[in-house]
A protein has these predicted regions:
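Short, solvent-exposed micro-motifs at the edges of structured domains
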Residues: 1-300
Length: 300
């Protein structure tokens, strides 16, 4: 891990560069895969008498490079905040053991004998990521007394804002068109860039499905891994809290009101990526809407 930073004073720090190479990763290897594809249809029971025999290899490669701008105000005068923007790229030749992690990439390597064809964006790659975290203690009410002080003093607000671009996705289809003898998810042929301009993306056509074509039998598809970028997310979580002190500070209480996805922004789940499925390229669900919760904590 390499970090280069330049301090701008007591209130801010600007990191410049980060690099995190990792040359080990888990790859799912089907031991039933044929060494080469042959142009003949063979009954699977002949070449695969034992189904679902897999091996895990720690031979995968991953690498992360990013530039980060960070602005921080340390707590003073009741206010602190941390703001970061990261432009980064995470690459790998494996999505984790049989498509682990976010499950948006592929279920293991299409061809374990050609891992160069598996190199692409990692499952957790966010090209753009902007975050803000802040705490602000409201200044009013400190000079009040009695009931007015209990009601108006001691309030503070918290905010966490997160904007990030979408995760990569890998198109695939079920079935063994290549006749390679395994149940690993195959990829189709890619004939053009499936990613649409943002202004053309809709829930019924998030990416250009005509760019994906099922390949002819007895060969692997030409699509790379993680060639589609899913929908980005916007998260704004807010909270208000009030501290109470009773009986000469011996009994304290804190009231909290928390608003997750406070602006009720619709964050879409990834679209369908399975060729031949009616949901291909379509978004059919969304993440949680606004959630409000209240809490009371006592300390004595």
């Amino acid at each position: 891990m390499l970090n280069l930073a330049e301090p701008l004073g007591p209130q801010a720090v600007v990191p410049d560069l980060s690099n995190n190479p990792n040359i080990r990763g888990d790859i799912g290897d089907s031991k039933n895969q044929l060494r080469r594809l042959v142009p003949v249809t063979i009954e699977k029971g002949v070449i695969i008498p034992l189904q679902n025999v897999f091996e895990e290899q720690s031979t995968g490669f991953s690498n992360y490079n990013a530039g980060t701008l960070r602005v921080e105000k340390r707590f003073s005068q009741g206010l602190s905040f941390l703001t970061t923007y990261t432009y980064g790229k995470a690459m790998s030749d494996n999505p984790g053991w049989r498509g682990g992690g976010q499950g948006l990439s592929s279920a293991g390597a299409q061809n374990i004998l050609n891992l160069k064809a598996e190199k692409g964006k990692a499952d957790l790659d966010h090209t753009h990521r902007f975050t803000v975290a802040s705490v602000y203690e409201l200044p009013f009410g400190k000079n009040l007394h009695g009931v007015a002080k209990q009601a108006l003093a001691g309030w503070a607000t918290d905010a966490i804002i997160q904007l990030q671009s979408g995760l990569p996705m890998t198109p695939q289809f079920s079935g063994d068109v290549a006749q390679m003898g395994t149940n690993q998810a195959l990829r189709p042929d890619l004939v053009c860039n499936p990613n649409l301009p943002r202004g053309e993306q809709t829930v019924d056509r998030f990416f250009n499905t005509s760019c994906l074509v099922q390949q002819t039998p007895f060969r692997y598809g030409t699509s790379g891994r993680a060639v589609i970028t899913g929908p980005g997310t916007i998260g704004i979580d807010l909270a208000a809290r009030k501290n109470f002190a009773f009986l000469s500070e011996k009994l304290k209480a804190q009231f909290r009101a928390e608003f997750f996805n406070a602006v009720n922004h619709t964050n879409w789940n990834p679209p369908g990526k399975q060729l031949g499925n009616s949901s291909l390229g379509r978004i059919t669900s969304a993440r949680d809407p606004r959630i409000v919760q209240f809490g009371l904590k006592l300390a004595f």
